[in-house]
UniProtKB/Swiss-Prot annotation:
Transmembrane segments: none annotated. Disruption phenotype: Seedling lethality when homozygous. Degenerated root surface structures and vacuoles with altered morphology. Accumulation of ubiquitinated membrane-associated proteins. Hypersensitivity to abscisic acid (ABA) due to impaired targeting of ABA receptors (e.g. PYL4 and PYR1) for vacuolar degradation, thus leading to their accumulation and an enhanced response to ABA. It comes from Arabidopsis thaliana (Mouse-ear cress). Ubiquitous. Lowest expression in mature seeds. Zn(2+) 2 binds at residues 477, 480, 507, 510. Endosomal sorting complex required for transport (ESCRT) component regulating multivesicular body (MVB) protein sorting and plant growth. Required for the formation of intra-luminal vesicles (ILVs)in MVBs. Binds to phosphatidylinositol-3-phosphate (PI3P) and ubiquitin. Controls IRT1 recycling to the plasma membrane and impacts the polar delivery of this transporter to the outer plasma membrane domain. Regulates ubiquitin-dependent membrane protein degradation, vacuolar transport, autophagy, and vacuole biogenesis. GO terms for molecular function: mRNA binding; ubiquitin binding; zinc ion binding. Residues 527-552 form a coiled coil. It is found in: Cytoplasm; Prevacuolar compartment membrane; Late endosome; Endosome, Multivesicular body. Phosphorylated at Ser-530 and Ser-533 by SNRK2D/SNRK2.2 and SNRK2I/SNRK2.3 in response to abscisic acid (ABA). Phosphorylation is necessary for ABA-induced FREE1 nuclear import. This is Protein FREE1.
Length: 601
């Protein structure tokens, strides 16, 4: 439909009622017929239709004869006449009732035809030219338009037009698509004598030209994309957009490739780039369960907190090796603190032995699994050796902890600034030299060690198994005390790192052990003579104990779960863990980082 074609829709709908030869001499002043009976509400319902309000079966020409007398007769002429200017004359015969064909259910008659554009094609005036009866009559020279009140129920016909002086000037540029132009009119009952007015301001022509009534776009509803409107009705010409055209809904569109993954609520599940679920659940229980299943709890070494100045201590499960004949190897808990090394009974925690830090002369590793330290009392002439056996990691940890504890105890008890390393080495060497000379003087020639195995207890060589006899003599290893033959005790080595230490007979096994021990002792001595190393070790011990004490207290205070002391099966370090409520839980050792299971029972 082209712009300016104002009659095509009319021809399409009412072509059977179109009169191609209109009356050339219409009667400007028809005689009023007998007054017709006003139709009741039932008649109005049956006879009215949406497109032609003024022509119903219950109304005669007298209903609007007064309206037409207010204007001069308007006849046919050759000028361009807008199709919306009615003649307000009654036809020579009653108009036939229009067909019962229902127009578009969403279409409304605008009942106000604004002035058409100046360039318009002429058309013959139909006998039904007064069909658009609600359009205002426009004087050729007038600049104002008058709008007659329209009663939607057609109770009293048309009222007289307002005087020109009271008509407001229309807005030359109204909003063409304003939804407020079609607000509901005041409703009145069918028997009211005062007709309610349905006044509308002027609007521009619909540039799209949907139909013969020049409806604006707002008649089609708020949905301009052919979708169903909120009221459930479909606008006209919904097939004019073609198939597959839908309204854009930006807020409801999901990202490409993620259909079904858009969040519907705060408890929904999202997915990352690798397809793993990302939960934003507000439930604290769910988050705690997921975190526990995804992460293994790390247990820290157990540290007993004491109220005195000794600070925190650490316990290690080790084996106390026998040093003399008659002793047995026992399992103990080695507790290292600033007060010394305590050997505790694992079952009763009773103190079996105590070695104060000030009495410990040195500490070194005999091999990867044995730690030895020497301790003496004021009544002892020579320091006694104590050997502790464990795995390699625990042995290294024990060595570092004992060394740091010794230097920290000296710094706390003595002066905070120890003597220089050169003087310390000289004084230590002099003392060791004098003590060694004195020990060599007073030591008997045939001295037997306490840990030596008696000769009568062994009849064969411990290493090669040769039977002892007149030609195969028994020899004791000065390090381990076992009995060997001469061929298995060819090694000679000093058992200590002292300068005047004598070379003694050792077995082949102890030869390698003592050599490794002496090399470790030299490295430890070179590391300990540095002042910075002393401070680092002391600081390390203090920080480690403080951290363990805080973590242990935090676990006790922050959690209502029962705590339990568990020994790591790998490094034998005692750990303080939370006992699970039921079943078992995987715990990671804070020392060796190896996982193990802790059961609820």
């Amino acid at each position: 439909m082209q712009q300016g074609d104002y009659n095509s829709y009319y021809h399409h709908q009412y072509s059977q009622f179109q009169n191609p030869t209109p009356n050339p001499n219409p009667n400007p002043n028809p005689s009023p017929p007998a007054p017709a009976t006003v139709a009741g509400p039932t008649d109005l319902t049956r006879n009215t239709y949406a497109s032609a309000p003024p022509f119903t079966g219950g109304y005669g020409s007298a209903d609007y004869s007064n309206y037409s007398q207010n204007y001069t007769p308007y006849g046919q002429n050759s000028e361009h006449v807008p199709p919306s200017a009615p003649s307000f004359t009654s036809p020579s015969q009653p108009p036939p009732s229009p067909p019962a064909t229902s127009l578009n259910p969403n279409s409304y008659s605008t009942f106000n035809q604004p002035p058409p554009p100046p360039t318009i094609h002429p058309q013959p005036l139909s006998s039904y030219g007064s069909f658009d009866s609600t359009a205002p009559y426009q004087q050729p020279t007038s600049q104002h338009m008058y709008y007659s009140p329209y009663d939607q129920h057609q109770t009293s016909g048309y009222s007289s037009a307002p005087p020109p002086s009271s008509a407001p000037a229309p807005n030359p540029n109204p909003a063409p698509y304003s939804s407020s132009l079609y607000s509901a009119p005041p409703y009145s009952s069918g028997g009211s004598s005062i007709p309610p007015s349905y006044e509308k301001p002027s609007v521009k022509f619909d540039q799209s030209g949907y139909d013969g009534y020049n409806r604006s776009r707002s008649d089609l509803g708020s949905d301009l994309y052919g979708k169903r409107s909120d009221s459930g009705e479909y606008p006209a010409f919904e097939d004019s957009y073609g198939d597959g055209v839908y309204a854009y809904q930006g807020g409801k569109v999901e990202p490409y490739g993620s259909r079904g993954t858009a969040p519907k609520s705060s408890n929904s599940t999202l997915f990352d780039d690798y397809g793993r679920s990302i939960s934003f659940s507000s439930s604290g229980r769910d988050s705690s369960v997921s975190s526990n299943s995804a992460k293994i709890v790390r247990a820290v070494p157990k540290a007993d907190v004491q109220e005195d100045s000794t600070g925190g201590v650490q316990k290690f499960r080790v084996k106390l090796l026998a040093e003399t004949y008659g002793q047995t190897t026992t399992d103990v808990l080695c507790q290292i603190g600033l007060d010394g090394l305590r050997m505790l009974d694992p079952s009763t925690s009773r103190t079996l032995r105590i070695y104060p830090l000030e009495n410990i002369t040195r500490c070194e590793k005999l091999d990867s699994s044995i730690l030895a330290f020497w301790s003496k009392t004021p009544v002892d002439i020579e320091a006694k050796r104590i050997r502790l056996q464990s795995n390699s990691y625990t042995t290294n940890t024990l060595l570092d902890t004992v060394t740091a504890a010794m230097f920290q105890a000296k710094e706390i008890g003595g002066s905070s600034r120890p003597p220089t390393s050169g003087k310390l080495i000289e004084q230590t060497a002099e003392k060791k030299k004098g003590l060694g000379d004195w020990m060599n003087i007073i030591k008997p020639v045939n001295e037997e060690k306490d840990h030596w195995v008696p000769d009568e207890a062994v009849s064969k060589c411990t290493s090669c198994g040769s039977d002892f006899g007149a030609f195969i003599r028994r020899h004791h290893c000065r390090n381990c005390g076992d009995v060997f033959c001469d061929k298995c005790t060819q090694g000679r080595i000093a058992l200590t790192a002292e300068d005047n230490a004598p070379q003694v007979r050792v077995c082949d096994r102890c030869m390698a052990e003592v050599s490794q021990r002496l090399s470790n002792a030299k490295e430890t001595t070179g590391r300990n003579v540095s002042l910075q190393s002393h401070e680092d070790l002391a600081r390390k011990l203090q920080e480690e104990m403080e951290r363990n004490r805080k973590s242990s207290s935090g676990l006790r205070e922050g959690s209502g779960r029962r705590m339990k002391e568990v020994a790591c099966p790998t490094c034998t370090v005692h750990l303080q863990v939370q006992v699970p409520v039921s079943g078992s839980e995987t715990i990671e050792c804070g020392v060796c980082q190896n996982p193990f299971l802790v059961s609820a029972h």
